UniProtKB/Swiss-Prot annotation:
Keywords: ATP-binding, DNA-binding, Metal-binding, Nucleotide-binding, Repressor, Transcription, Transcription regulation, Zinc, Zinc-finger. Binds 1 zinc ion. A zinc finger (unnamed) spans 3-34. Residues 49-139 form the ATP-cone domain. It holds the Pfam family Zn_ribbon_NrdR. One of its GO terms (molecular function) is DNA binding. It comes from the Bacteria. This is Transcriptional repressor NrdR. Negatively regulates transcription of bacterial ribonucleotide reductase nrd genes and operons by binding to NrdR-boxes. Its cofactor is Zn(2+). It comes from Geobacter metallireducens (strain ATCC 53774 / DSM 7210 / GS-15). The keyword DNA-binding applies.
Length: 150
């Protein structure tokens, strides 16, 4: 595995153990060139349904794209990276159980919003503001009113 510090192509595994959920392997590696250590996570590559975008394009599910969007919504909030990872793990679990070959991106977005609503309401509103593409302040205020009613 290529070293993230010096880009040397070889490293050795110094420790290997299952992660907390058992769905992945956490490995500590040491670069054979600069001797710096880094962590990698190995997980089974699942066959997930393709994501059907609003414009009709189809693309593979990208875990890091979802993580990035959620992290952006949770910026400067008391939401840990571990919480975000668990949220995305649950999302991937739902995708694995999805019975069709394609899943609309709108469905994934709604799942994320449902999860975020339970975790952090500010992160929920931030994610919704990007995901729902409010056309004006009135639409945004209507979403806030719905949130306050719940």
């Amino acid at each position: 595995m290529k070293c993230p510090f010096c880009a040397h192509p070889d490293s050795k595994v110094v420790d290997s153990r299952p992660d907390k959920g058992g769905a992945a392997i956490r490995r500590r590696r040491e670069c054979e060139s600069c001797a710096k250590r880094f962590t990698t996570h190995e997980r089974i590559e699942e066959t997930l349904p393709l994501v059907l975008k609003k414009d009709g394009r189809r693309e593979p599910f990208d875990r890091m794209k979802i993580v990035g969007g959620i992290l952006k919504a949770c910026e400067k909030r008391q939401v840990s990276r571990e919480t975000v990872d668990r949220l995305v793990d649950r999302l991937e679990g739902r995708l694995q159980e999805w019975s069709e070959k394609e899943v609309p991106s709108t469905t994934i977005g709604e799942w994320v919003m449902t999860e975020l609503h339970d975790i952090d309401e500010v992160a929920y509103v931030r994610f919704a503001s990007v995901y729902r593409s409010f056309k004006d302040v009135n639409e945004f205020m209507a979403e806030l009113q719905d949130l306050l009613k719940k």
